[in-house]
């Protein structure tokens, strides 16, 4: 398992995890499940980002949330809470161990994730996106926004 970095067109440095075959294999089922769940959320534009403008064209106002290094910094503990709403504790604990319990090598150093989860691992983005939707939904409910 290793981490690689590269620059993107927005002049940000991206860190991507390259996991071993077995870790990716066990993560793939959850990855598929979570992405299918995201397809059912009408506000999500993961699969068609161009649809965003047509969804808001008649809105008086809208808010957009952009998080820098979201998968790397968003607490995996929050993602785990969301997953525990659907999966047993032992499953989610095993997911956490596969995601962040095993160290990565980056530039000859051994590193472990302390907060987020590794972009590049199956289920990484989808688990973050789903937890993010839950948080926004909760906030809207608390504020009386439908």
Predicted ranges, named:
Residues 1-146:
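Core nucleotidyl-transferase/polymerase catalytic module
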